[in-house]
Design a protein with these regions (language model features):
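Residue signature of alpha-solenoid helical repeat architecture, marking inter-repeat boundaries
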Residues: 27-28, 73
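Flexible helix-coil transition and linker loops at the boundaries of alpha-helical arrays
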Residues: 59-72
C-alpha cells in the first residue's frame, strides 16, 4: 500500500515536472535567449552561447518594420556578444562581421573599438595561404 502511494506521488511529480519543462521550452522570447547566451558565456559553454545569440538574431529580423527600441538594443547586443564569442573561438572573420553588424545597429564607442581591435588582430596575424 505504501509502495503504491509513493509510486503515485512519484508519477505525479514526474508529470508536473514534464509539463513545466514543456511550457518553459515554449518561451521563445529574444530576451530569454540573450540571457541564456550570456549565462553560457559565463560558464565557458561557447558553442551553446553561439546558438542562443543566433536565435536572438533569428527572432528579431531587421526586415521587421515594427521593431521596438528594446528589441533593437537586444539585436545589437546579440551581434556584439556573438562577435566576442567568435573572438574567443578564434573565428576572426565571423567576429568582424558580427562586430560590424553590432556597430551598425548601435554605433557606440565600445562597438567601434571592438571592430577596430578585430581588424588590428587580422592585420597582425600571418597571411593565410592562398589555395
Amino acid at each position: 500500500m505504501l509502495f503504491k502511494s509513493i509510486h503515485n506521488v512519484t508519477g505525479r511529480c514526474f508529470l508536473s515536472l514534464f509539463l513545466l519543462i514543456l511550457v518553459g521550452c515554449k518561451d521563445d522570447s529574444p530576451d530569454r535567449h540573450l540571457q541564456l547566451g550570456n549565462w553560457y558565456v559565463q560558464k565557458g559553454i561557447l558553442d551553446e552561447a553561439v546558438l542562443e545569440f543566433r536565435e536572438v538574431i533569428r527572432l528579431i529580423p531587421l526586415t521587421y518594420k515594427d521593431i521596438s527600441k528594446e528589441e533593437f538594443k537586444m539585436l545589437g547586443t546579440a551581434h556584439y556578444n556573438l562577435a566576442l564569442v567568435y573572438t574567443k573561438k578564434g573565428w576572426w572573420d565571423f567576429a568582424l562581421k558580427e562586430a560590424q553588424n553590432s556597430f551598425n545597429l548601435q554605433p557606440t564607442a565600445s562597438h567601434y573599438d571592438l571592430v577596430q581591435l578585430i581588424k588590428k588582430r587580422e592585420e597582425l596575424s600571418p597571411q593565410k595561404p592562398q589555395s
